[in-house]
């Protein structure tokens, strides 16, 4: 792979004769088959795979022979199963071929994304949920509007092939891709005659299509936004929030003048803030109400011009930071003004300056989370805890571990937000629901369960020290968390309860059918 990267950096003409021969390498399909089994075993139970699903090099050779005969749809579908992208448990041969196709296309894509991102003025596309938390900590001294955008994920297969054709000169390597996409588009389960690419799918092939599609969108959209909202630089001799800027030293540039020994500090003063996770993105900009309407209109035109698809107007919503609140990844996002008093003394006079900046104020949606707990049978509609009858067949340790993981993951996800006192109401619901579940299992009361199992049992599972990941400084972290916002780094993805609530909010906005110029 290092040699591929070296060739790609020196000369991109190697792509003209490199990709297509990889389809005839038997080892590639063996590797892809191992990747397929590893991914399937992690996401699906092994009971779905029978002993007859064995990998045969003889079948692979036949598939390669049919690829040489240009019968791509026969290779990928007819000899394996009728619809491999929908029912992937019927046979693993089609998935192995798709994995091999994905491995071949990932080689130039990884090289292109690596070197093109380096040349985009240090712009990096956010790929992890951990990149959301610095965005929530950012200051917005100039932005007064946000655009909440949901990237459309229904796209025509030929548009995807054309996006690949822009940077892959090896045209024969795209024939299998075109066959796969059109076969999937013509499947009976697909009524829209388009490809659904989204980050929530599990197949590696569709995930690769999604990453490529989003990369193409951002590589075109981000430079346009940066040209429209050009950042300015302001020079300062000293900063009132020097501690805050030192923690974000990468945004400060030291400029030395040639004819002077003095040096000044130039702070990047951006007029645009952008963050994306999955199909949701937020753009914070500065402008008038008319300018925001135009920007919203151009975003909708962008999908039509570059990808020939119609994006519904409700997928791009605009909100004024000082008046409205929005939902993003399970948080209520509001903006509050933060004032800072600066005292400046000049000779015998003392000046007091009040600097006001805007910052995000993420709030925990307590009431919606309690409603989701009621839907999952942890409590009733009023928030009164009830027993989880489906878990009474489990052991006591499994029941305690499940309730503890729900609480710990929920607390860690909202650890850096405001209004965390309401989380302890959710803790009370979960702990009492756990006690009632154990009492229902042993056919006794909560008092008897506490007496038999001991009071230390619930303290071990729902202890306050387990809410923090600082073993040596747990007491200090607990005291500091009441004053500061601490984001935990063990959050792999959006919390399931928060994700369910976010989907409900998206459905409400979709059913509302917001007009293009309503906001």
Swiss-Prot record:
InterPro entries in UniProt:
Domain_X, Maturase_MatK, Maturase_MatK_N
Any one GO CC term of the record: chloroplast
State a single Gene Ontology molecular function.
Answer: RNA binding
Q: Where in the cell is it found?
A: Plastid, Chloroplast
User: Which Pfam families does this entry report, sorted A to Z?
Assistant: Intron_maturas2, MatK_N
* Record carries keyword Metal-binding: no
Q: What does the record list as GO biological process?
A: mRNA processing; RNA splicing; tRNA processing
Which keywords has UniProt assigned to this entry?
Answer: Chloroplast, mRNA processing, Plastid, RNA-binding, tRNA processing
| Origin: domain of life | Eukaryota
Instruction: Please give the chief subcellular localization of this protein.
Output: plastid
What the record says about family reads: Belongs to the intron maturase 2 family. MatK subfamily.
Q: What does this protein do?
A: Usually encoded in the trnK tRNA gene intron. Probably assists in splicing its own and other chloroplast group II introns.
What is the designated name of this protein? Maturase K
Q: Which organism is it from?
A: Keteleeria davidiana (David's keteleeria)
């Amino acid at each position: 792979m290092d040699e591929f990267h070296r060739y790609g950096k020196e000369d991109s003409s190697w792509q003209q004769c490199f990709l297509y021969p990889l389809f005839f390498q038997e080892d590639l399909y063996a590797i892809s088959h191992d990747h397929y089994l590893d991914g399937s075993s992690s996401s699906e139970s092994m009971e779905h795979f029978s002993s007859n699903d064995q990998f045969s090099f003889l079948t692979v050779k036949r598939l390669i022979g049919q690829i040489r005969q240009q019968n791509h749809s026969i290779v990928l579908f007819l000899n394996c199963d009728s619809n491999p992208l929908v029912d992937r448990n019927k046979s693993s041969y089609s998935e192995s071929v798709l994995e091999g196709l994905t491995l071949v296309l990932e080689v130039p894509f990884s090289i292109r994304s690596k070197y093109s991102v380096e040349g985009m003025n240090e712009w990096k596309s956010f790929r992890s949920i951990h990149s959301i938390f610095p965005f929530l900590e950012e200051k917005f001294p100039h932005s007064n509007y946000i655009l909440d955008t949901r990237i459309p994920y229904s796209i025509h297969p030929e548009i995807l092939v054309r996006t690949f054709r822009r940077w892959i000169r090896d045209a024969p390597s795209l024939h299998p891709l075109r066959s796969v996409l059109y076969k999937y588009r013509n499947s009976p389960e697909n009524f829209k005659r388009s490809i659904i690419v989204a980050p929530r799918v599990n197949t590696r092939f569709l995930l690769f299509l999604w990453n490529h599609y989003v990369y193409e969108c951002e590589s075109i959209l981000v430079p346009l936004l940066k040209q429209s909202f050009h950042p300015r630089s302001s020079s300062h001799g000293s900063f009132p929030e020097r501690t805050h800027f030192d923690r974000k030293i990468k945004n400060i540039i030291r400029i030395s003048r040639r004819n002077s020994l003095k040096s000044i500090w130039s702070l990047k003063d951006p007029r645009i803030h952008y963050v994306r996770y999955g199909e949701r993105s937020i753009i914070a900009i500065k402008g008038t109400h008319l300018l925001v309407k135009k920007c919203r209109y151009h975003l909708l035109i962008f999908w039509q011009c570059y990808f020939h698809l119609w994006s519904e107007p409700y997928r791009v919503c605009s909100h004024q930071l000082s008046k409205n609140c929005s939902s993003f990844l399970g948080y209520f996002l509001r903006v509050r003004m933060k004032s800072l008093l600066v005292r400046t003394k000049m000779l015998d006079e003392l000046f007091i300056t009040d600097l006001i900046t805007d910052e995000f104020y993420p709030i925990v949606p307590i009431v919606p989370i309690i409603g989701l707990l009621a839907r999952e049978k942890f409590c009733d509609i009023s928030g009164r805890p009830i027993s989880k009858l489906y878990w009474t067949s489990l052991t006591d340790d499994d029941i305690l571990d499940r309730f503890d993981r729900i609480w710990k993951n929920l607390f860690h996800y909202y650890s850096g937000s405001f209004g965390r006192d309401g989380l302890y109401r959710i803790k009370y619901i979960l702990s009492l629901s756990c006690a009632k579940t154990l009492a229902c299992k042993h056919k006794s009361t909560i008092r008897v369960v506490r007496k038999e199992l001991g009071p230390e049992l619930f303290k071990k599972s729902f202890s306050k020290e387990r809410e923090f990941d600082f073993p040596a400084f747990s007491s200090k972290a607990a005291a500091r968390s009441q004053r500061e916002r601490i984001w935990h780094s063990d959050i792999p993805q959006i919390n399931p309860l928060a994700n369910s609530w976010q989907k409900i909010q998206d459905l409400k906005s979709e059913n509302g059918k917001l007009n293009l110029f309503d906001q």
